[in-house]
Amino acid sequence: MLSQIWILFTFMVCVIASKSKSDGLKFEITKKIPISKCKLKALPGDMVSVHYTGSLAENGKVFDSSLRRNEPIQFKLGAGQVIAGWEQGITGMCLGEKRTLHIPPELAYGSRGAGGVIPPNAVLDFDVELVDIARN
């Protein structure tokens, strides 16, 4: 019985660890693409297109959304064009996958905040969907 409990505990730790990065980024896969249908995963160097909605974790206030503009953001993954939490959270996503990224301040805008909309030291939540990958 004790060994079964230990196995269950170990499994739960592995599941939790697989969904967070060691440096504080946490994410939840909200739309998983089956392995058999995941033909392309986002890798550094890829040009990716992402739909997103960003909100403040403390109160859920939405500060930006590409869905409102009906235009995904495009950027080169790994080139430092977006916050570090996005770089880490989008790497490895399958085309069509959706995730919720829970990004601590040190992987977002830190003590400076951003544009009068994101306060200093804010934890951010982003619902993201990988809509395109262009690989050279």
Curated annotation (Swiss-Prot):
Record-listed E.C. numbers: 5.2.1.8
Give the record's GO biological process terms. Answer: chaperone-mediated protein folding
PPIase FKBP-type domain boundaries: 45-134
Q: SUPFAM superfamilies attached here?
A: FKBP-like
> Tell me, what controls this protein's activity?
Inhibited by both FK506 and rapamycin.
Q: Does the keyword Endoplasmic reticulum apply?
A: yes
This entry's Gene Ontology molecular function terms read: peptidyl-prolyl cis-trans isomerase activity
**Which keywords are on file for this protein?**
Endoplasmic reticulum, Isomerase, Rotamase, Signal
Gene3D superfamilies named in the record: 3.10.50.40
Which residues are the signal sequence here? Answer: 1-17
Primary location? endoplasmic reticulum
The subcellular localization recorded is: Endoplasmic reticulum
Gene Ontology CC entries for this record: endoplasmic reticulum
Question: Which reaction is recorded as catalysed by this protein?
Answer: [protein]-peptidylproline (omega=180) = [protein]-peptidylproline (omega=0)
Tell me, what does this protein do in biology? Answer: PPIases accelerate the folding of proteins. It catalyzes the cis-trans isomerization of proline imidic peptide bonds in oligopeptides.
Q: Which family does it belong to?
A: Belongs to the FKBP-type PPIase family. FKBP2 subfamily.
Question: Which PANTHER family does the UniProt record give?
Answer: PEPTIDYLPROLYL ISOMERASE
Q: What is this protein called?
A: FK506-binding protein 2
